[in-house]
Amino acid sequence: MAKKVAVFWPGDYRSKPNEWATPQAREATAQLMAALIRLGRTPYQVEGFLTKPDQAIARLGPIDDPMVGVFVHWAYAPHTVDGVVGKDNPLLLASNFSGTWPGLVALLNTGASLESVGRHASRAWTDAPDWTKDAAFMERLDEWCSTGQIVHDASELHQPGPVGAAAQAIADGVAEAIRRRRVLALMLGDTSMGMINGYFGPRLLYPIGFAEHKVDQAWLVDRERSIAPSRVEAAFAFVQEKGVTFHWGEPDAEDFTPEATKAQLRMYLAVLDLLDEFQADCLGWQYQLGLLNLLPPSDFCEGLLNSHARPEGNGHVVITSTEADQGNLVPMELMKRVLEAKGLPGAVMFHDVRWGAMHEGRWLWVLLNSGSCGAYAFNDDLDRLDGVHSYRQPSGYFPVPGGTFAGVSRPGPITWARTWVDRSGGLVMDLGRGESVALPDDVREAWWRGTTRQWPFMAADLGCSPETIMAHYMSNHVAVAYGDLFDEMVALSAKLGIRVRVLSAT
């Protein structure tokens, strides 16, 4: 591999997050450059954060040297992908491993986005204060410098085995129902923040029994104005009576008031009307960045839609995928249908793979996303919203006040899934078994405050090593359901023509 190595900073479009992350980026870059020099390379830095696709095209496109992207916070995938797609120079994605500064989340999203467009990239990560002192990181970096790629252990990636007759029968029934009536996804916008890996489109959705109907988010600005005040007041009374705890007017959230919650409920009702108008089965909702300065955050609305107890509801959830992510929408809708076919509540949670650590000899991931986690994760009473807490979304990211749909996830066995696009253009369903784990209060609070305290929390064993997730997982998002529906999902995915990949230590 060539001696010269270009080091660049993938960035957020928003200036504030980049400003906050600059000290971390500088420190990590200094350590990375020291490591590269130690390995006999000559690193140089591409100027500044890449905050728009055109900057990636202009600054990365002309570079033929090997390249390293340094991820220390959330970054948009096109700020890397658009500058390197179609090229074959060695590319390494290198991230920190921090809950507070989620570079690993951006690495997972960018790696999956690169895979979906057929661009090879290697991955390396470290939680060490000094990257040069992490032996495992240095070993991976040395391998990349020597060969242009890193080959990670793949022993926990498997083909699925045979499934039992009962699971096959349920899968066959769900597949037949989809054959009779195609799943219609209402898409409010296309992806969010450049999540290339989260958009499939009709060419990939039609063959697996899905269709999408796109509605511009601008409709919401108009539609929510015509919602009758009486409906908003009834919805407001409903969520209070059902047990939601609202954290209005707390420090750093003085502008989060009952009126802000009512504005969110008005938006929820407008979306409910759109779902009814188009008779859609499920929903993908972009929100960011288009509505950021116009309407309150969508998170409380999404949490309600993913709950059985909701205003003007029918006793069932409406599967809702935040950030219009079809890679989670597909498995969430399929898991809901399998659960209901098994006579179980059709609740499926949407989360980010945010951070992880050892606890009592066991690796646990903190799964944490501001939207799309329903109340069933926090209590097992389908008629209640107890355990739901609504905090103001952090104002540094969300200027219009509005609340989240947070809580502590119950312990229990889980099945998890994710659909992604491989470099040949085909769909793959990742599946695994795991467990939602109850942590001691002090540990949970420390982990929660080390990430984002306002968002719903799950500590989960995903049934495979952290190295397998970091090296091979093709998203920062994951769909989680309580119970064991692994075999049914294997059979259903195969029936619909989706290739299955199992992630498991056994």
Can you say where each PLM-predicted feature lies in the sequence?
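Active-site proximal loops enriched in glycine and acidic residues that flank catalytic Cys/His/Asp
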Residues: 9, 286-287, 350-354
